[in-house]
Amino acid sequence: MNLRLLTLALAAVAAASPVDIQERQLSGGNELRDGSCKPITFIFARASTEPGLLGISTGPAVCNGLKMAKAGQVACQGVGPKYTADLASNALPENTSPAAIQEAQDLFQQAVTKCPDTQIVAGGYSQGTAVMDDSIKRLPDNVKEKIKGVVLFGYTRNAQEHGQIANFPKDKVKVYCAVGDMVCDGTLIVGPAHFTYLGNTGEATQFLLGYLRFLQLTQLP
């Protein structure tokens, strides 16, 4: 793996994928931990080098899409701060750190414990897809059952996991792998195609909403 190439490419993500300031303000990012329970909880793991908890590209875009469709009913929670989105963790055996995996598991568990009536949707971008894969497949069945859909952008474990998340229903997972994005082929070589996923966030939002559409959603106390 060429960590220098990965560093240079991912360092450009903020410039390549700007998000409107108002959208960033809407996105929050720590609303499960700090806010009240909502009928829908969105848990997201950002790409390497992205700042904040949700990042500044696909995470806020999907969060805001859900909030616009389900006004007042969505809490958005990013994985962090133990998940640091550092570059070196991409080279670990599970393509992210044990601390990141455990933190994501804890957030899913917290959503179920704190807000037992909430429905969970989730997502990840780049290294964040590994965080989602490695955490969700380890969750107990009662927590997995609360996760209604997962969207993965530039899935770094796509080849290893055969386009799915192990021990989780394949039909609940939507993988976005752009033509030419070599991270989806089991490498960590990052090229321009890896930075095109903002264009998929509208479809990804609709995918998640499709699993929520027929649920009885009421405002939680």
UniProtKB/Swiss-Prot annotation:
N-terminal signal peptide: 1-16
Molecular function terms from GO: cutinase activity
Positions of disulphide bridges: C37-C115, C63-C76, C177-C184
Transition state stabilizer (site feature) positions: S48, Q127
Stated role: Catalyzes the hydrolysis of complex carboxylic polyesters found in the cell wall of plants. Degrades cutin, a macromolecule that forms the structure of the plant cuticle.
Family matches, as InterPro entries: AB_hydrolase_fold, Cutinase/axe, CUTINASE_1, CUTINASE_2, Cutinase_monf
Subcellular location field: Secreted
Protein name (Swiss-Prot/TrEMBL): Probable cutinase 2
Any single biological process term in GO: carbohydrate catabolic process
Active site: S126 (nucleophile), D181, H194 (proton donor/acceptor)
Family the entry assigns: Belongs to the cutinase family.
Entry keywords, A to Z: Disulfide bond, Hydrolase, Secreted, Serine esterase, Signal
One cellular component (GO) term of this entry: extracellular region
Catalytic activity as recorded in UniProt: cutin + H2O = cutin monomers
EC number: 3.1.1.74
